Amino acid sequence: MRYLPLTDADRSAMLSVVGAGSVDELFADVPAEARLSAPIAGLPNHASEMAVERHMARLSANNVTAGSVPFFLGAGAYRHHVPATVDHMIQRGEFLTAYTPYQPEIAQGTLQVLFEFQTQVARLFGTDVANASLYDGSTACWEAIAMAGRITKRGKALLSGGLHPHYVETARTMARFTGDVLDTSAPVLTAAPDDDALVARIDGETSCVVVQYPDILGRIPDLAKIAAAAQAQGALLITVVTEPVALGVLQSPGSLGADIVVGEGQSLGVGLQFGGPYLGLFGCREKYLRQIPGRLCGETVDADGKRGFVLTLSTREQHIRREKATSNICTNSGLCALAFSIHLTLLGGSGLADMARLSHLAARKTAAALAQVSGIEVVNSHFFNEFTVALPHDARQIVRDLADRHVLGGVSLGRLYPQEAALANGMVVAATECTTDEDIAALVAALKEVLA
């Protein structure tokens, strides 16, 4: 919607309609102390465009961009190469919106893109269907928990200790209002996740088991075992994928028995961009189709028998009675979904596998190099492109010391789990196809200096 300025005559006409003699009279109900009567003290006057550009450039020079230093951060947001073609394509006027294509007769291009996106997500996840996107991975995770509750008529969700703590906190926030019980635990610094302990906590009141794949420490759980145990108790397995590139080499969660698969699509096409906006991915078995949150784009034929695309299901509160809605999602992450779809299309199946192999190789090189540093232990026995190291003392300070040496060395578990003293020395390290041998050498050298 374009900004249309108002003239004094426009304002007078509007005030006349509502029966107010002036703008001050219109806002008379607002306490005087809450109204702005003069310029804000200390706020500078306007400046020229060139002066503002220079000022903003000076401020931005204080930032450290992901590509300017050795970068090993991950834990749910990853630095991958995004081809320039992606940004070029999403800036086309036909696509540059996140808004819902309510009128199929004038939105066939957008609807077809969403249909193709759904197909790609379903194939990636190994599920029968996928929706047209959600806001991000954490909200998609909660939507899956809520969906499992509707399906099973149960109110207790079992969350694996390997689930990202921010996803857990998002679920806790929502559960405060829904009354759902969340059975949670913190991860333990072990080479592999304790799947047997998780399975032992499943009972007849469990609606779903939520497992991250790979988990927050980079470990790879046995989804088939957990799926069998959950389904034997009448519960659903929800698998959370925060790094979809991993599915270029790992078996898809759906093929391993997951009932619902959700994830964060940031790795493909979206970029880090200061933490958002990101992209929620959601897929499930076809028999749960009518419980899926958000929107589903489908293929049909028009009155002339020509192929067309429409919003087949939109069981959200704007479309149906609130008490019957499966979700209150509003406009979805359509533009981010387009970027994801373009990037994945450019890669193709073999390209995604190559990207995954390069990321895995970079992580293996990094882990091998760090294992040679005195005082550092690589915790994981198996991993994709992310692993955890145990450091000789508090990892938060070590991360800060590395940053002072212009190396972004990892995410400290003390930051993610500030109440868990047993995790304070842990640091999660990620590598991708962007990681070079020089980056690895710089990390090793900086760590040796910090730990000396």
UniProtKB/Swiss-Prot annotation:
Keywords: Oxidoreductase. It catalyses: N(6)-[(R)-lipoyl]-L-lysyl-[glycine-cleavage complex H protein] + glycine + H(+) = N(6)-[(R)-S(8)-aminomethyldihydrolipoyl]-L-lysyl-[glycine-cleavage complex H protein] + CO2. It is an enzyme of class 1 (oxidoreductase). The keyword Oxidoreductase applies. It comes from the Bacteria. NCBIfam families: PRK00451.1. Its EC number is 1.4.4.2. It holds the Pfam family GDC-P. One of its GO terms (molecular function) is glycine dehydrogenase (decarboxylating) activity. The glycine cleavage system catalyzes the degradation of glycine. The P protein binds the alpha-amino group of glycine through its pyridoxal phosphate cofactor; CO(2) is released and the remaining methylamine moiety is then transferred to the lipoamide cofactor of the H protein. The glycine cleavage system is composed of four proteins: P, T, L and H. In this organism, the P 'protein' is a heterodimer of two subunits. The keyword Oxidoreductase applies. Belongs to the GcvP family. N-terminal subunit subfamily. Gene3D superfamilies: Aspartate Aminotransferase, domain 1, Type I PLP-dependent aspartate aminotransferase-like (Major domain). This is Probable glycine dehydrogenase (decarboxylating) subunit 1.
